[in-house]
């Protein structure tokens, strides 16, 4: 059995205790160090569909280094075999509107291609560091079917997770072409974890 710890790549959550969190970093530390993404108005980016989740500056190398440090600290000496890293996003699911990011954040992406590139670099940074410690990285690789080679690249450090396998939900199943485009993910590399519409709740 492989046991993975959940950590979010892309958000910090203001309702989580710093010592027991799903985010890589606690909210207070992220805020203090200036790693919360901001709009031109100076407001932080709270996810529209998940209150209390705030977009992190995943394009900031200092944030990425600290995220890795914190996750390795939290994982050391535990039974976990690695990390399931959530929100390796492909599209804007959370009302980010990247064009509105603060203009003085020179490294900030202003389109989704730029955000995907930043997350790709982040996944590689995390993967190398976890591999050095004998740990797996299994990102939740959103919509890998939409970009050739995306699954293979992001799953290279231990495997991949697709939480929308064969459909968005019970009332939004994929057509045959879309479902078949997901099929190669079953061949790896590494672990392949998929979540299908269940017909139930939860």
At which residue positions do the language-model features occur?
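Glycan-processing catalytic domains of CAZymes
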Residues: 1-202
């Amino acid at each position: 059995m492989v046991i993975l710890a959940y950590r979010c790549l892309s958000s910090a959550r203001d309702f989580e205790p710093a010592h027991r969190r799903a985010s890589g970093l606690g909210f207070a530390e992220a805020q203090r160090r200036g790693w919360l993404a901001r709009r031109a108005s100076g407001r932080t980016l709270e996810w529209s569909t998940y209150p209390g989740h705030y977009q992190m500056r995943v394009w900031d190398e200092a944030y990425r280094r600290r995220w890795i440090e914190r996750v390795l600290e939290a994982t050391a000496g535990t039974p976990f075999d690695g990390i399931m890293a959530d929100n390796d996003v492909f599209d804007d699911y959370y009302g980010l509107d990247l064009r509105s990011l603060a203009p003085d954040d020179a490294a900030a992406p202003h389109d989704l291609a730029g955000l995907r590139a930043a997350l790709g670099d982040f996944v590689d940074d995390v993967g190398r560091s976890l591999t050095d410690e004998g740990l797996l990285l299994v990102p939740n690789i959103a919509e890998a079917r939409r970009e050739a080679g995306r699954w293979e690249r992001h799953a290279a450090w231990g495997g991949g997770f697709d939480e929308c396998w064969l459909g968005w939900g019970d009332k939004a199943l994929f057509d045959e072409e879309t479902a078949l485009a997901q099929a190669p993910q079953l061949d790896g590399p590494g672990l392949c974890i998929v979540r299908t519409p269940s017909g139930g709740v939860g």
